[in-house]
């Protein structure tokens, strides 16, 4: 996924509603633990732990999360142990990204972490697999403190199965020494510039469905119906979807466009000065800001003009990071308490300050001045009202591969305006195919 991988979750998206971790050491001192969480694919297994010496009942918890959050989560786990001295907590951690959580947990639920982070498009899949423990501790408080859309993304059939803590979508970074605020209002404005030293005016990961869907959403197309829950509906092949296809074919053919820019190319392009603007998210904010310095800027995605002359605002696919509790944990009350701690207001604020993560906590997200003080989070907030929350229905599993294939065919030139309708029909047919 990112990934196939928000004005009041970040303020208006979260109220309007528009798809990682571990710890070691202890709060004081302790002994090492050798248990480890498993990981595979793009995840890297690691282990480590520590035992609090505060006393009382001994409780061992395993926590999974992405590599980039490990140190932060260790700190939060240690603070949890210190805040609960009536028990002795030991923690083991494994490196498993949010994107890989469902795959790794479902390999063997009984052997998976007690607490793990996952992306919101996996909620229904994990629930249907019997992998998530229903939230029964402080549920009303969690619902009240977080945005409506994030709670919806963590729920199935009205029951809460996770603890949301990050709102996520993509937006546009740009080098303000190369482009003005007026230039970046539209793709046409960006692409019209001739900029010394720049080989790519605008970069986008065309064959990544998470990003690609933004063009279709901008034109008014729907993935799985109006609310994203109808597995029989996808209209990317209608008249407006066809105009999106036309636009992408022309855009990819422009030598000033970077058609297949993943995170590494975006970061290196800004670092060496050959890139003027690119679509990405908060996870790259630190490195891009370091590269651009005083010329660092970010804003909502640009508008683009369809072949009928209509100008539309590019949309985006939004999701949430959620902390879940294993349905087979031996310590459900402690695991729920830890998951709630890792996602509480204070720790969401810490993630905002240290990782540029946009909070789902309503009070934090409503602090417009603070949110806008972070350029990347401010841009995410601007884009939020144009975002569509990523669905978690099982049918979504069928979306990523056809989206990738469609993008690759445009890049390769095998999808042309002559056969575009056939390609779009095949795209939609594959998305709506019966799940195996």
Place the predicted regions along the sequence by residue.
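Short, well-ordered beta-strand elements
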Residues: 56-68, 88-94, 115, 200-202
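Hinge/lid segment of periplasmic solute-binding proteins
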Residues: 119-171, 182, 297-301, 372-373
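Extracytoplasmic/periplasmic solute-binding protein
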Residues: 161-165, 170, 188-234, 275
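Extracytoplasmic "Venus flytrap"/periplasmic binding protein-like
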Residues: 79, 83-146, 177, 182, ...
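Conserved C-terminal helix/tail region of periplasmic/extracytoplasmic solute-binding proteins
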Residues: 368, 381-436
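Extracytoplasmic/periplasmic substrate-recognition and gating elements
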Residues: 290-354
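A structural signal for short loop-to-beta-strand junctions that line the ligand-binding cleft
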Residues: 106-107, 111-114, 142-176, 200-205, ...
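Glycine-centered hinge/linker elements that transmit conformational signals in sensory
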Residues: 230-260
């Amino acid at each position: 996924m990112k990934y196939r991988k928000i004005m009041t979750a970040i303020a208006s998206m979260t109220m309007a509603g528009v798809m990682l971790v571990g710890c070691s050491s202890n709060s004081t001192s302790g002994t090492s633990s050798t248990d480890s969480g498993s990981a595979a694919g793009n995840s890297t297994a690691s282990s480590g732990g520590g035992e609090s010496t505060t006393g009382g009942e001994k409780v061992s918890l395993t926590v999974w999360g992405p590599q980039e959050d490990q140190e932060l989560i260790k700190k939060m786990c240690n603070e949890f142990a210190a805040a609960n001295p009536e028990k002795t907590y030991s923690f083991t951690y494994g490196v498993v990204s949010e994107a890989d959580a469902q795959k790794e947990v479902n390999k063997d639920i009984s052997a998976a972490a007690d607490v793990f982070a996952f992306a919101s498009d996996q909620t229904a899949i994990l629930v249907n697999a019997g992998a998530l423990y229903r939230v029964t501790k402080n549920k009303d408080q969690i619902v009240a403190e977080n945005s409506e859309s994030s709670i919806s993304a963590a729920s199935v059939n009205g029951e809460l199965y996770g603890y949301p803590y990050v709102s996520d979508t993509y937006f546009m970074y740009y080098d303000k020494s190369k482009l003005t605020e007026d230039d970046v209002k539209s793709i046409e404005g960006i692409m019209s510039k001739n900029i010394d030293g720049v080989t790519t005016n605008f970069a986008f990961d065309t064959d990544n469905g998470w990003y690609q869907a933004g063009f279709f959403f901008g034109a008014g197309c729907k993935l799985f119906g109006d609310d994203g829950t109808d597995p029989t509906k996808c209209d990317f092949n209608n008249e407006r979807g066809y105009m999106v296809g036309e636009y992408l074919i022309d855009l990819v053919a422009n030598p000033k466009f970077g058609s297949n820019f993943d995170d590494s190319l975006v970061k290196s392009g800004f670092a060496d000065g050959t890139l003027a603007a690119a679509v990405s998210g908060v996870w790259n904010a630190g490195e891009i800001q370091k590269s651009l310095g005083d010329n660092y800027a970010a804003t909502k995605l640009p508008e683009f003009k369809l072949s009928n002359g209509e100008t539309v605002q590019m949309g985006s696919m939004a999701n949430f990071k959620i902390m879940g509790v294993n349905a087979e944990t031996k310590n459900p009350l402690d695991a729920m308490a830890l998951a709630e701690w890792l996602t509480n207001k204070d720790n969401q604020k810490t993630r905002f300050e240290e990782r540029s993560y946009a909070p789902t906590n309503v009070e934090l997200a409503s602090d417009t001045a603070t949110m806008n003080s972070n350029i990347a989070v401010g841009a995410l907030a601007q884009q939020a009202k144009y975002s569509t929350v990523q669905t978690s229905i099982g049918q979504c599993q069928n979306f990523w591969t056809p989206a990738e294939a469609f993008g690759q065919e445009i890049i390769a030139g095998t999808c042309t305006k002559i056969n575009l309708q056939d390609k779009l029909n095949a795209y939609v047919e594959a998305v709506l195919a019966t799940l195996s």
